[in-house]
C-alpha cells in the first residue's frame, strides 16, 4: 500500500495512492481421495483437485484451433500429437484464473474548498474461461439458431475451405467439448470511481444561520477496458451509478 503527498500547502493538497495484491494458492496432501470428483468434473468444469495444483487452475485439452480445410477443431494430445478426437485424458493446466497482480491506484486533489478524486482498478495476468463463446457462439441448439444470438456465431464461424476461423463450422451440431480454445488472457482496467466536491464556509451563510455548504458528485465504473469480449450483467445486474448531494450545516 502506498499513499504519497506530492504537494502539501495550506491551500493545496495533492496525493496519490496505490495498492496491489498477489496471491498463490496450492493444494496439499490430497492424494487420490478426490479422484472420483476429478473424473466426474471432466465434462462439466475446469476445476481439478491434485496435490500441488491450484484451486484456480483451468484444466482443459489443448487446442490448435480450427482446421481451415474442414472446419473441425484440432486438439493436442499430452504427447503433443495433433488429432481431431477430443479425449479428456489429454487435459492439462491451460491457465489460472487468479491474476498475477491486482489492486487500485488513484489520486486526490484539494484546493481552497474544491476536492476531486479518481480511482482505477486494475487486473494483470490470469486467464478466464469464455462461457459466452462456449455457450452462445458454439454449442447452440438447432432451435436456438432461430433466436437472437451473439453476432460472432454468424460472422466468426468457419464457412468455406481455406477459411481461417476462430470457431468451428456451424453445420457441426455435435456438442463442443471443453478445450483451451475458450481460455483467454484476462487483463482489465476499470475506472472505479470519480468524485468532485466543493465546501464553502463564507460569512454569507450566517444570514441563513448556516456554517457551511457542501456539494458532491460521484460516479462509479465510468469506463472499462478488457482484453476479453464477454457478456456482463447476465447473472447479476450490471449498474453504473451517478449520485449528487447537497448539504447545509447549521
Language-model segments: what does each one mean?
Residues 16-18, 118, 215-217, 246:
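Membrane-embedded beta-strand positions of outer-membrane beta-barrel proteins
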Residues 25-41, 45, 125-153, 225-232:
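Outer-membrane beta-barrel and related beta-rich outer-membrane complex signature
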Residues 10, 113-118, 203-206, 242:
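Repeated loop/turn-to-beta-strand initiation elements of outer-membrane beta-barrel proteins
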Residues 6, 20-26, 111-113, 122-126, ...:
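Transmembrane beta-strands of outer-membrane beta-barrel pores
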Residues 123-214, 219:
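Extracytoplasmic gating/loop element in the C-terminal half of outer-membrane beta-barrel translocons
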Residues 5-97:
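Conserved small-residue
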Residues 38-70, 151-163, 176-178, 218-250:
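C-terminal beta-signal and terminal closure region of outer-membrane beta-barrel proteins
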Residues 12, 99-103, 187-192, 211, ...:
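Residues that define the transmembrane beta-barrel architecture of outer-membrane proteins
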